[in-house]
Amino acid sequence: MAPTVMASSATSVAPFQGLKSTAGLPVSRRSTNSGFGNVSNGGRIKCMQVWPIEGIKKFETLSYLPPLTVEDLLKQIEYLLRSKWVPCLEFSKVGFVYRENHRSPGYYDGRYWTMWKLPMFGCTDATQVLKELEEAKKAYPDAFVRIIGFDNVRQVQLISFIAYKPPGCEESGGN
């Protein structure tokens, strides 16, 4: 017996004709009088400055700002505390990453700083952190001191900024 093949009664689908024009979509419509025309800021901006490539090293989060005043430090620390982060102080004689013994990255290349005491778990007052900063500055006047904010839930460092630069440090711009 020969097998019988039954013709399918399904409807046929039109062949693919290519992508439709998106001109009818609201995203692609452009108004000719939107006011943007040929946008260019190249000729109008004259106040933008470039960070010098020599003489002033860049540090951490707030490197491009002038040195922080005590009021600025208090505001940053209060933000850190409001965000429920744990403040920690770290210090180092060399305030930047360097490699003196090997070409590849390693533990002793300046990425890891020495922690000042323990993280300040439970700290709720920014002035407590400033007191610790003053103690660190007194104990190590020729070291950089940074404040970091640690999230103990996610176990990550979320903010880090230099709070003190040693005097006479020309590559840091002084303090």
UniProtKB/Swiss-Prot annotation:
Subunit record text: Heterohexadecamer of 8 large and 8 small subunits.
UniProt family annotation: Belongs to the RuBisCO small chain family.
Record: transit peptide: 1-46
Taxonomy of the source species: Eukaryota, Viridiplantae, Streptophyta, Embryophyta, Tracheophyta
Any one of the GO CC terms: chloroplast
GO molecular function: ribulose-bisphosphate carboxylase activity
Localization per Swiss-Prot or TrEMBL: Plastid, Chloroplast
Known role: RuBisCO catalyzes two reactions: the carboxylation of D-ribulose 1,5-bisphosphate, the primary event in carbon dioxide fixation, as well as the oxidative fragmentation of the pentose substrate. Both reactions occur simultaneously and in competition at the same active site. Although the small subunit is not catalytic it is essential for maximal activity.
InterPro entries (UniProt xref): RuBisCO_ssu (IPR024681), RuBisCO_ssu_dom (IPR000894), RuBisCO_ssu_N (IPR024680), RuBisCO_ssu_sf (IPR036385)
Domain of life: Eukaryota
Record keywords: Calvin cycle, Carbon dioxide fixation, Chloroplast, Photorespiration, Photosynthesis, Plastid, Transit peptide
Protein name per its UniProtKB record: Ribulose bisphosphate carboxylase small subunit, chloroplastic 2
Transmembrane segments annotated in the record for this chain: none
Additional record remark: The basic functional RuBisCO is composed of a large chain homodimer in a 'head-to-tail' conformation. In form I RuBisCO this homodimer is arranged in a barrel-like tetramer with the small subunits forming a tetrameric 'cap' on each end of the 'barrel'.
GO biological process, one term: reductive pentose-phosphate cycle
